[in-house]
């Protein structure tokens, strides 16, 4: 049987962005899903230091504990916004229900927060009552980001957040992400096949190859002076494009 990911050991610090790159089938999405608790590993542990200082084993939590953690301290931005949004309710509701899940009930405050976040992610506030299905792909992705960040999580997982977007839309979204990550002091685990995205957003980089870590280090170091033959091939293929 094929092993999706093995012999991976890593740490992540508050405010740090860790990029995971590699070709399709290299194990990067498998690793992301295990780190975020969405996929159970056959061996090993994922430890998370919560806001109260307690060290939690993500995969030892029961479903209620895991959901509570996802509501309060963790976020997950999907490659396809439809996987992370409720497409049949308004943009304001998509943002507000995350707050309601944490106990917020005052409609005026929920509405004001939703409007503030739409503005922060550069969506016209007059579109607050539109459903995501009425938005462009880029706007849907920005709404998904707002929905995740409205609860001020400490750690956000991002799976190809700019994938499938036009170049101009991608550039605006990257600029937005860079500023939000910096301003909020987020820790981020970012999966991308685009080395330009990895260079712009991540501090450290992991190169995955056949389910294993081929190389890891500071992003500029790995991309400017790759040591592993696969890393060299990956970088050179981008330079030739």
What role is predicted for each listed range?
Residues 198-200:
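A short, surface-exposed alpha-helical micro-motif characterized by mixed small hydrophobic
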Residues 131-135, 139:
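Conserved ABC ATPase signature
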Residues 36:
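Helix-to-loop junction immediately C-terminal to a conserved catalytic motif
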Residues 213-217:
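ABC ATPase "signature
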């Amino acid at each position: 049987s094929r092993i999706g990911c093995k012999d991976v050991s890593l740490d992540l610090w508050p405010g740090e962005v860790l990029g995971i790159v590699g070709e399709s089938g290299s194990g990067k999405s498998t690793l992301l899903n295990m780190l975020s608790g969405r996929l159970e590993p056959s061996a090993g542990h994922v430890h998370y230091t919560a806001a109260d200082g307690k060290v939690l084993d993500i995969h030892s939590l029961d479903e209620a504990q895991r959901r509570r953690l996802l509501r309060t301290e963790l976020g997950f931005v999907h490659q396809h916004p439809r996987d992370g949004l409720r497409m049949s309710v308004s943009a304001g509701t998509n943002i507000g229900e995350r707050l309601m899940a944490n106990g917020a009930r005052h409609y005026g405050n929920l509405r004001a927060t939703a409007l503030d976040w739409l503005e922060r992610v550069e969506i016209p506030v007059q579109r607050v009552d539109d459903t995501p299905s009425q938005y462009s792909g880029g706007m849907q992705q920005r709404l998904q980001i707002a929905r995740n960040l409205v609860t001020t999580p400490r750690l956000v997982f991002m799976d190809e957040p700019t994938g499938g977007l036009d170049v101009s839309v991608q550039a605006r979204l990257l600029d937005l992400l860079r500023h939000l990550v910096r301003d909020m002091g987020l820790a981020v685990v970012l999966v991308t096949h685009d080395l330009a995205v990895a260079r712009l957003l991540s501090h450290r980089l992991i190169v995955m190859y056949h389910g294993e870590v081929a190389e890891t280090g500071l992003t500029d170091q790995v991309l400017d002076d790759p040591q592993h033959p696969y890393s060299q091939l990956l970088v050179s293929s981008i330079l030739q494009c």
